[in-house]
């Protein structure tokens, strides 16, 4: 038994000597950097279709709003807050799941929706026709059975979609006021997104950062074929 223990001990010592620099680099640089400065996020669902599609790897700027102590929600330096139209990465107030959603309502805003048309502070948002180039990466079934539009959110235009065949009671809701220190977020795929219509307002401290770019993208339904046209593209 002692021989076995000695062999294991020597093996572990040799492995430590060989890998210690890499392990220390990972522990003291890579992990803190991903936690506080910049990160990437694989998107597994279609809640942000057509802006973000399943299989996108998005870049997350964790310095967009503040600098945080690594691996915590504690803010070391605050310099801005989420703005209307931001695509933000945040923790769900419901179960701490990591989500990618669009900021719709700011503190004090009055939000209302009538048949998938948004009203903010009593003003109806402007909607216009969406170019087909914005939906070319969606599944064929969605392209042919969904309704698409370009939504103007305080001058920030972005794509939204709805699918009439999806049963939901969230296409309309009454006037709600966003509390101080909280935000109202939604997915661009309005009929297939679990967002503030389900889990309520999101506290400011739960925002992780801003998703700004697609790094790479792979089609999970087609043997993970790369979508080269989405590589290194900006998110609106």
What feature does the model see in each segment?
Residues 2-15, 36, 41-42, 50-236:
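Soluble "head" domains of membrane/secretory-pathway proteins
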Residues 20-36:
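Hydrophobic membrane-insertion alpha-helices, especially the h-region
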């Amino acid at each position: 038994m002692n021989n076995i223990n000695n062999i294991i001990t020597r093996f572990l010592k040799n492995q430590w000597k060989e890998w210690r620099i890499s392990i220390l680099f990972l522990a003291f640089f890579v992990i803190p950097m991903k936690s506080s400065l910049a990160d990437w996020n694989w998107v597994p669902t279609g809640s942000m279709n057509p802006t973000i599609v399943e299989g996108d790897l998005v870049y997350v700027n964790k310095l967009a709003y503040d600098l945080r102590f690594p691996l915590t929600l504690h803010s070391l330096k605050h310099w801005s807050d989420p703005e209307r139209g931001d695509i933000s990465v945040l923790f769900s107030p419901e179960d701490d799941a990591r989500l990618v959603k669009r900021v719709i309502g700011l503190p004090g805003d009055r939000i209302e929706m009538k048949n998938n048309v948004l009203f903010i502070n009593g003003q109806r948002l402007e909607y216009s026709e969406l170019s087909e180039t914005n939906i070319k990466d969606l599944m064929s079934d969605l392209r042919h059975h969904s309704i698409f539009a370009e939504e103007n959110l305080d001058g920030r235009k972005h794509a939204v979609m709805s699918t009439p065949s999806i049963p939901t009671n969230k296409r309309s809701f009454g006037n709600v006021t966003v509390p101080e220190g909280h935000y109202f977020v939604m997915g661009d795929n309005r009929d297939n997104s679990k967002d503030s219509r389900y889990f309520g307002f999101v506290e400011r401290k739960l925002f992780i950062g801003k998703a700004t770019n697609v790094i790479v993208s792979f089609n999970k339904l087609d043997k993970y074929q790369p979508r080269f046209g989405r590589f290194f593209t900006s998110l609106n």
